[in-house]
Amino acid sequence: MELSLLLFLALLLGLLLLLF
């Protein structure tokens, strides 16, 4: 697993948590 991909997924999850 690439760190960049993991970081991107973590950022997406964070944005979803902020929206909801």
UniProtKB/Swiss-Prot annotation:
Its cofactor is heme. This is Cytochrome P450IIB. Its main location: endoplasmic reticulum. GO terms for molecular function: metal ion binding; oxidoreductase activity, acting on paired donors, with incorporation or reduction of molecular oxygen, reduced flavin or flavoprotein as one donor, and incorporation of one atom of oxygen. It is a peripheral membrane protein. It catalyses: an organic molecule + reduced [NADPH--hemoprotein reductase] + O2 = an alcohol + oxidized [NADPH--hemoprotein reductase] + H2O + H(+). Belongs to the cytochrome P450 family. Cytochromes P450 are a group of heme-thiolate monooxygenases. In liver microsomes, this enzyme is involved in an NADPH-dependent electron transport pathway. This isozyme is active upon P.nitroanisole, aniline, D-benzphetamine, delta(9)-tetrahydrocannabinol (THC) and strychnine. It is found in: Endoplasmic reticulum membrane; Microsome membrane. It comes from Cavia porcellus. Its EC number is 1.14.14.1. GO terms for cellular component: endoplasmic reticulum membrane. Keywords: Endoplasmic reticulum, Heme, Iron, Membrane, Metal-binding, Microsome, Monooxygenase, Oxidoreductase.
